[in-house]
Regions:
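Short internal beta-strands
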Residues: 1-3, 108, 195-201
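Short, conserved active-site loop motifs that form the nucleotide-linked donor/cofactor pocket
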Residues: 21, 128, 220-222
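Short, acidic/turn-prone active-site loops that include or flank metal/cofactor-
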Residues: 82-86, 133, 221, 226-229
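Small-residue-rich anion-binding loops in enzyme active sites
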Residues: 1-21
Length: 239
């Protein structure tokens, strides 16, 4: 739900992954619009290829949209990162997780507590498989490569004593009062510890909308463009 073309391309390039064979062209939008568009664009692909299984990953709008399409067509769904719960139903991701798990045929989990969450929700044990955390696998696979990045030198950040910030969840940045409170705390922290802030496009738009740019510029928070996977890994590993 936070799609940005430049950020998406950077991940494929950094991780050495082939570009998608099919691009649905949905982009950003409200939760309802994005979910509906993914469903209407994805269904013809499924009808054409007639897969036995479809694998969906994570907790974003495309996850639940594709799972719904397959469930209605009688195609089996495997959900990677199943069973994760925040217990906060105000989060769009939490709704996506719960609904996707409830209609998936194979639930691939990252941790024991995810298994326990699914069991407590009545998911049969034969549907649950603990497979580990693909995000950690990716990190370990690319950590040595990320060490070659020159991002810290390019930005001129010190070897130690700096923080890295990410902030983009709607619950944190869409409400002016909430965002202002978070920003006030960050500005106070930046007086003791400089903060490097790769700004997500939707957060950047909210900073402009709420008139926070001057406050940030007057602080020790440094705004930079979003980073690719390897540069970001190098940056936060030294923070």
């Amino acid at each position: 739900q936070h799609y940005d073309a430049a950020m998406s391309d950077a991940f494929f390039d950094d991780l050495g992954m082939p570009k998608p064979n099919v691009y649905l062209g949905v982009g950003s939008g409200s939760h309802a619009i994005q979910t509906a568009k993914v469903m209407t664009e994805f269904e013809p692909i499924v009808l054409e290829h007639k897969p036995d299984w479809v694998v969906v990953v994570g907790d974003v709008n495309s996850t639940i949209a594709c799972a719904l399409v397959c469930s209605k067509l009688g195609i089996k769904v495997a959900h990677v990162e199943a069973g994760l719960r925040s217990r906060d139903r105000s989060m769009p991701e939490e709704i996506n997780r719960i609904l996707t798990d409830s209609i998936s045929d194979l639930l691939l989990t990252t941790s024991q507590d995810a298994d326990e969450n699914l069991a407590s929700e009545g998911i049969p044990s034969q549907k649950i498989r603990f497979v580990g955390n693909v995000m950690i696998d990716s990190l370990l696979e690319h950590l040595k490569i990320a060490e070659r990045s020159t991002i810290r030198e390019d930005l001129g950040v010190p070897d130690t004593d700096y923080a890295v910030l990410t902030l983009h969840r709607p619950s944190n940045v869409d409400d002016r009062a909430i965002f202002s409170g978070i920003l006030g705390s960050l500005i106070a922290i930046s007086e003791r510890l400089p903060i490097i802030f790769p700004v997500h496009p939707r957060t950047k738009a909210k900073i402009e909308e709420f008139g926070f740019k001057d406050s940030i510029n007057d602080s020790n928070i440094r705004l930079i463009e979003p980073l690719g996977y390897l540069d970001f890994t190098r940056l936060y590993s030294g923070a």
